[in-house]
Amino acid sequence: MLEQMYEALQRLRKEKPVILNITNYVSMDFLANCFLAIGASPIMSVSDLELEELIGLSSAVYLNIGTLDHLFIQRSYRAVDIAIRQNKPIIFDPVGSGTTKIRTEVSHHLLAHSTIVRGNASKILSFGDLSIKTRGVDSANTTHDAKETAIALANECLCGCAIAVTGAVDFITDGKRSATIELGDPLMSHVTGMGCSLTGVLAAFRSVIDDSFEAARLGVEYFSLCGMLARERCEGPGLFKAYFLDELYAADFDRMRRYYEQ
């Protein structure tokens, strides 16, 4: 599997795919730096006027509803329509789905047309049960709780969707294939924007891998392994953030192999 990961990263760094990000303002800087570290070329757009052109230039479209308002909703819906027309993959992070009515409704609309969806267990469960309430961006549920919902959602999506349920344990499925991943480090949950950036990395991997399940699986594994390597070098979240970017960039597969083969 490390060989597949290496090949995908080499393609990323050779092709430098453009990823259009329609995302939140909280994690935008860190997200852009993660894209650059792995070799992708991010565009962070906030204008409806250039959507058609930018999606035409992009290899994937990343939607993240972290900072939601009516203008963002209109922009994201229009981006989906254009991306479908241009046959571009849509990678979606349903931040806060299940927390408020509007977030849940927007998430349901965007889910139907997504190529990859990534969220913690509570966000994924909110798609299957409108009565579920979540705690902002945090999850009160475990990955195991969300497995059946994730498989059902993957089978219901219109675009052959892969669902990535992430947390202490990660679960990836496209409805037919599934993978459980036990990598990463608890310190990753103490850095704002880490989940948003993980979804961005999945968008980058999907831009060079046509199989959404494989793109999600390899992206989650690479991101998690980089977190483990960064944790070796620090004790707290401040330095961790910097070292994590270094590890994304370094792609030290010799060090990764120690964790991957345990």
UniProtKB/Swiss-Prot annotation:
Residues that hold substrate according to the record: 44, 193
Keyword NADP: no
An example Gene Ontology biological process: thiamine biosynthetic process
SUPFAM superfamilies attached to this UniProt entry: Ribokinase-like
Binding site for ATP: 118, 166
HAMAP family, per database record: Thz_kinase (MF_00228)
Cofactor: Mg(2+)
InterPro entries according to UniProt: Hyethyz_kinase, Ribokinase-like
Catalytic activity, EC: 2.7.1.50
Described purpose of this protein according to its UniProt entry: Catalyzes the phosphorylation of the hydroxyl group of 4-methyl-5-beta-hydroxyethylthiazole (THZ).
Catalyzed chemical reaction(s): 5-(2-hydroxyethyl)-4-methylthiazole + ATP = 4-methyl-5-(2-phosphooxyethyl)-thiazole + ADP + H(+)
GO MF annotations, alphabetized: ATP binding; hydroxyethylthiazole kinase activity; magnesium ion binding
Protein name per Swiss-Prot or TrEMBL: Hydroxyethylthiazole kinase
Keyword terms, alphabetized: ATP-binding, Kinase, Magnesium, Metal-binding, Nucleotide-binding, Thiamine biosynthesis, Transferase
UniProt family annotation: Belongs to the Thz kinase family.
Enzyme class: transferase
The keyword Chloroplast is annotated on this UniProt entry: no
Source organism: Chlamydia caviae (strain ATCC VR-813 / DSM 19441 / 03DC25 / GPIC)
Pathway(s) the chain acts in: Cofactor biosynthesis; thiamine diphosphate biosynthesis; 4-methyl-5-(2-phosphoethyl)-thiazole from 5-(2-hydroxyethyl)-4-methylthiazole: step 1/1
